[in-house]
Amino acid sequence: MEEGNNNEEVIHLNNFHCHRGQDFVIFFWKTQIIQREKTESL
């Protein structure tokens, strides 16, 4: 039973890592757009 719980924990961590990765990509994409707008306004 302990092995099963460990497997669920690993899957949960993998899903969490994937979601964090997506958030980081979106955050990076937004910051790139903001930087572009600032340079264009100058």
From Swiss-Prot:
Q: What is this protein called?
A: Putative protein RNF216-like
Native source organism of the sequence: Homo sapiens (Human)
- Top-rank taxon, per record: Eukaryota
